């Protein structure tokens, strides 16, 4: 789904299409009407059968619903409170906070690396001591 | 007006026209065109027949010779709603004109009014675009910050757990010391007649003590 601004612009364009289609379709399907006090003596022109639907009502509903949708989308737009200065200061504050959290993350990673080195050194000492004990035991057995 | 005078195309050329300028041979012979310099502070430049000013990102309605229907200081949402309602009223007026007097010049005036309303609405909505871009950037930075904080917290938790495991392993070591003492006792009883090996009896205990000292130093 698109963002709200794009939805709103699409709805406005759709409303314009509804305007054009309403006038075009109603004009196309309209019936000829008789002039007052101007009737022919001869046989009347046969009137075509009326259309099944009421296009005027249909387009009226479409246009009204579209206008209501536009109002709803306009209501969802942000207020003027979040102005450019507020946004810029918020962006700068976020940048500073991001740099701070990046430094914190680096410090934690460095602590982890130090602990890893200590553990590796401890394991190395343990292995060395075990090797020394094995050598000593061999000497004792001999 | 400017389009009719200068006949500027409204779209860029297809990419092949630009790619052909940057073949390896052209680059080697220094024939490839360089990127244009950035415009100066108040320079007005033309892009596809439309004049752009560097100060304002979106051209105002006055500079486009379009009548402005909204005041200078306004509430955008209220003005947009007014324009929306004006659209409906103007459309109803247009229908009345079509019913009563289809050939009057006021019909075309009404159509122009409706077009003007649509242009103003779209302009107001497009003025929200820079705000939207900044808001999107702010949301991205918020997500980045939250990710970093969560990653640091998770790493710290793992670090504490590793320290606990190491301390637990270290606190379990005295049991080995007791076992070693009993083992030493066994060795003493076995090699008691041979006095020449008395010096060798100290070696395993000495090695074990050295290992413990190194471990304590490393952890602390």
From Swiss-Prot, chain A:
Residues 87-111 form a coiled coil. GO terms for cellular component: mediator complex; nucleus. It comes from the Eukaryota. It holds the Pfam family Med21. The keyword NAD does not apply. Component of the Mediator complex, a coactivator involved in the regulated transcription of nearly all RNA polymerase II-dependent genes. Mediator functions as a bridge to convey information from gene-specific regulatory proteins to the basal RNA polymerase II transcription machinery. Mediator is recruited to promoters by direct interactions with regulatory proteins and serves as a scaffold for the assembly of a functional preinitiation complex with RNA polymerase II and the general transcription factors. Required for activated transcription of the MtnA, MtnB and MtnD genes. Component of the Mediator complex, which includes at least MED4, MED6, MED14, MED17, MED18, MED20, MED21, MED23, MED24, MED27, MED30 and MED31. Also interacts with MED7 and MED10. This is Mediator of RNA polymerase II transcription subunit 21. It comes from Drosophila melanogaster.
Swiss-Prot record, chain B:
GO terms for molecular function: transcription coregulator activity. It is found in: Nucleus. It holds the Pfam family Med7. Keywords: Activator, Nucleus, Transcription, Transcription regulation. GO terms for cellular component: core mediator complex; mediator complex. It comes from the Eukaryota. Its main location: nucleus. InterPro entries: Med7/Med21-like, Mediatior_Med7, Mediatior_Med7_sf. GO terms for biological process: regulation of transcription by RNA polymerase II. Belongs to the Mediator complex subunit 7 family. Component of the Mediator complex. Interacts with MED21. Component of the Mediator complex, a coactivator involved in the regulated transcription of nearly all RNA polymerase II-dependent genes. Mediator functions as a bridge to convey information from gene-specific regulatory proteins to the basal RNA polymerase II transcription machinery. Mediator is recruited to promoters by direct interactions with regulatory proteins and serves as a scaffold for the assembly of a functional preinitiation complex with RNA polymerase II and the general transcription factors. Required for activated transcription of the MtnA, MtnB and MtnD genes. This is Mediator of RNA polymerase II transcription subunit 7. It comes from Drosophila melanogaster.
